[in-house]
Amino acid sequence: MTIAEEFATRNFSIYGQWTGVVCILLCFALGIANLFHVSLLIIFSALCLVSSFLIIFIEIPLLLRICPTSSTFDTFMRRFTTNYMRAAIYMGMAIVQWLSIIIAASSLIAAAVLLTIAAGFYALAGLKGQGFVGSKTLGGQGVAQMIL
């Protein structure tokens, strides 16, 4: 199944997963870019950077098999196999980035917006009763089942 065919299924968990991949890149870039502020914004940029690494392991299940991680971390990551749990963690990460506005308006708002959109896609998938479907391109079919 190609990416175009995956999008044609109209499964919101696929949309959420691909939005999550974009979140990885955006959170990583903005986390590094905002580390150079001389204010409390550094805390939020560090949290954005940490979020990018969490999202990598959430959205690309093959990495849990490849990278040496502790059993505690693996257990924590396996909690996010349903649409509702993924929506919850994305919304949690989005709220943290929205709170960065308290310190100063910065480019971290873009990360907050995209994380909120990803949470929305996963929440819609849950509300519509769509089961979580992992993208084949990201190792979702077959490989993901070996990990779980």
Swiss-Prot record:
Primary location class: Golgi
Cysteines paired by S-S bonds: none
Topology of the protein relative to the lipid bilayer: Multi-pass membrane protein
Kindly indicate where the leader peptide sits in this chain.
none
**SMART domains (UniProt xref):** Cg6151-P
* UniProt keyword annotations, A-Z: Glycoprotein, Golgi apparatus, Membrane, Transmembrane, Transmembrane helix
Q: Which InterPro entries did the record assign? A: TVP18/Ca-channel_flower
Query: Where, per UniProt, does this protein localize?
Result: Golgi apparatus membrane
Give the GO cellular component terms, alphabetically: Golgi membrane
The regions listed as transmembrane in this protein's record are 12-32, 38-58, 82-104, 108-127
Note the superkingdom of the native organism.
Eukaryota
Which residue positions carry a glycan here? N11
Which Pfam families does the protein's record reference?
Answer: Cg6151-P
Does this entry carry the keyword Metal-binding? Answer: no
Return one Gene Ontology term, BP aspect: vesicle-mediated transport
Protein name according to UniProt: Golgi apparatus membrane protein tvp18
Which species?
A: Sclerotinia sclerotiorum (strain ATCC 18683 / 1980 / Ss-1) (White mold)
Source organism phylogeny: Eukaryota, Fungi, Dikarya, Ascomycota, Pezizomycotina
